[in-house]
Design a protein with these regions (language model features):
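C-type cytochrome heme c attachment motif
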Residues: 73-80, 153-155
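C-terminal motif of bacterial Sec signal peptides marking the signal peptidase cleavage site
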Residues: 17-19
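Thioredoxin-like thiol-disulfide oxidoreductase module
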Residues: 89-91, 96-153, 157-163, 182-183
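Sec-dependent N-terminal signal peptides
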Residues: 4-14
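A short acidic/small-residue loop/turn micro-motif
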Residues: 170-172
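Short active-site neighborhood of thiol/selenol oxidoreductases, capturing the structured segment around
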Residues: 61-76
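N-terminal "domain-start" segment that seeds a small globular fold
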Residues: 25-57
Length: 185
């Protein structure tokens, strides 16, 4: 009887181990596939950026507050925020569910129409590489912090496109989530 039991254990144990291992591998594979499917097809795979031209129509149809994300070319902090904070799944969900998001180059030389006013850049960086000037829309909406302007800057507008608050500099993920939750109401 002992020999039979020993033989049974010796021959079935490898199958149990292989079977368990395959289940773990299959489970990991399924989770990876599921994450890929969600990422590629989901409303929450990235922030749904819109153009400034679309905002008035969108707000009339479905009123929400607006987030303007001002960046500039060559800004390492802007890049870091785009690659960390703005790809966080919770941040994406908070933004997509509660705000309209618009990304703007704060030093663009293009004219921007906003609330019936055309804003320009009086001294674009292309004309004078040493210029620290920013677009007039940026200057209109961004509050100076300690006497200066910082990149990136996040601006929150109400449903009438009036300034609620501007937040200078990079916003780390936990800080940005709190900011979004505080101004959702």
């Amino acid at each position: 009887m002992k020999q039979f039991f020993f033989t049974l254990v010796v021959f079935t144990l490898p199958f149990v181990v292989v079977s368990c291992n395959e289940n773990a591998t299959n489970q990991e594979l399924k989770e990876t596939e599921l994450k890929q499917i969600i990422k590629s097809n989901s409303y929450y795979s990235s922030i749904k950026w819109i153009s400034l031209d679309e905002i008035e129509m969108k707000i009339k149809k479905n009123p929400r507050k607006v987030i303007l994300f001002f960046t500039k070319k060559g800004c390492p902090y802007c890049k870091e925020m785009k690659e960390t904070t703005l790809v966080d799944p919770e941040v994406i969900k908070l933004v997509n569910d509660n705000y309209y998001a618009i990304a703007l180059d704060g030093k663009t030389k293009e004219a921007i129409n906003f609330k019936g006013v055309t804003y320009i850049n009086d001294a674009s960086i292309e004309e004078d590489p040493k210029s620290t000037w920013r677009h007039n829309l940026f200057a209109e909406l961004v509050e100076p912090y300690n006497g200066g302007y910082y990149w990136p800057t996040t601006v929150i507008l109400d449903t009438n496109l009036n300034l609620i608050k501007s937040f200078p500099g990079i916003q780390k993920t936990p800080q940005f989530k709190r900011l979004l939750m505080n101004y959702m109401r």
